[in-house]
Amino acid sequence: MPGEGKTFAHKRETMEDRTVLHRMIAALVILVVASHVTGAEKGGLRITNGWFTQDGRVIWGCAQHNGWWGGYRQGTGWIRQYKVRTALCRRAPGRVGPSFTEDLDKLTDAMVRYGYPGFEHNYGLWYDRRRDNHDVQRRTDANVQPPFLEQPWARSEEGTAWDGLPKYDLERFNPWYFARLKEFARLCRKKGGILFHNFYMQHALLETPAHYVDFPWRPANCVQDTGMPDVIPAANVFYDVTNDARRELHRTYIRKCLDELGDQTNVVHLVSEEYTGPLSFMEFWIDTLIAWERETGKRLHIGLVGTKDVVDAILADPVRGPRISTICLSYWWYKADGTLFAPQGGREVAGRYTGNLPRETTPQSLYRQIREYRRLYPDKAIIQHHEVQLEKAWAFLMGGGSMIVARMQYADSVPPKQPWEPPDEYIAPPEALVIQPTYDFIRAHLAAALPHMRPADIVRDNEDRTWCLAEKGKEYLVFALRGGSVTIDLGETPGQRFQAQWFDPRSGDLSPAGVATGGGTASFTCPDDRCRALWLHATNDL
């Protein structure tokens, strides 16, 4: 089984023709370059003025959040109450395609085509589909039911885990799992996508007993003494690295992930899916990443995800804060009434109270949250888990947000199949179709300009529902949430002429809006009372 792979020794490089002096000079060059480069290597992912970019072009849109369990099983189809999502490390022997072993090449093609160029990965809740009905029964045999969700840890040759298979060895790793992630990351760099890699999956530690019974670190499932409890809640114990054995197991695993993915420029590293853990573990995780960077001379995109108190503490840290390239604002928000929902870290708050519940937000409250952090940290990219709704997607963009992480299920086959089956090809998820016109508009007209644009307070009417991104004197993008009149201050660009166009985010249509001249205010009236965007582009041809 792929999960029982051996640990491979690093290949040693022999360079007998090099002198000792040559080696020292090369090492010094690497260290100097690494100390000054703020993004990935040339051709890979960079953070430019708070935007994800590659080769000078913005990467904006949705990110698919991966599937945790399930997949197509012959004779039963999908689980009707749970249409599964894409999973990079799902393995269906002999079957390739949606809901089986994903075709990574076709998947990444679909991502950049259909408006979700990002993908957020974490390992699955259990290995095989016998656990899909969420029972906690100990398996008496190894009669597994594919497809499998491969885990990062390898199986040992000792004992029997709760799922009837050999116990895990937490110091050995699954080569198939990491090969899949490396190949996906390589394709992301090639095509302009991003892998958001979660090292852990907190959901298994808190939500329900069925999610924890097969977890590799549970005492019944591994050969090491992890000190973990036999039942949930288990998160705070898992994150307690004052236990020497558990601390070293964490460090070994974290470094394995970095050894496998650290060369991949289009990867943003995140501590965990649904992380509501303590500040202490976040500090330990970041310190382990920074130590690896120092040892290797390589540079990582470190993402920060957690509760507001933990996120704010790290960003205020004079050592750790500057190393953060990406902020995830998923586990706190402003409600529609303006009050703050912000649970504290380290309280074992489950995902059903943060990432999974319907959010009582408005476009205005979402804009407020994103804009606040963009103002405080203008050079860091911002992502957030959120439902994909047109007005909120635009509020997120106008506040300076880079990518909306969404739990997008496979689209139904066209025409629908009976019984319920996955599509034969990767077609656009319904959620991605919501922003498809906007995604196409940005790629066609603003891909090179958006990295130089920032939220700007130059709107002079309906400020509570009209927002602007601007590169002064060159490009202006104004979003009117409810249509109506749009007035912007162009006083700092006297004499400059701008071509103005209306953009309909529902249809993707562009229509003329006239000409504006800098040096004062410019006013426009939306074609109707629905949301519209106004695009002003500097020109000398008018």
Model-flagged regions — what are they?
Residues 248-252, 261-427:
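Extracellular glycoside hydrolase catalytic/binding regions
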Residues 45, 52-98, 231, 235, ...:
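Extended substrate-binding grooves/exosites of carbohydrate-active enzymes
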Residues 371-381, 389-514, 525-542:
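Aromatic- and carboxylate-lined catalytic core of secreted/periplasmic carbohydrate-active enzymes
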Residues 13-25:
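Bacterial N-terminal signal peptides that target proteins for export
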Residues 45-326:
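Active-site mouth of glycoside hydrolases
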Residues 29-37:
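Hydrophobic h-region of N-terminal signal peptides that target proteins for export
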Residues 4-16:
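Short, Lys/Arg-enriched N-terminal segments with co-localized hydrophobic residues
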Residues 520-522:
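Short strand-edge motifs at loop-to-beta-strand transitions and within beta-strands
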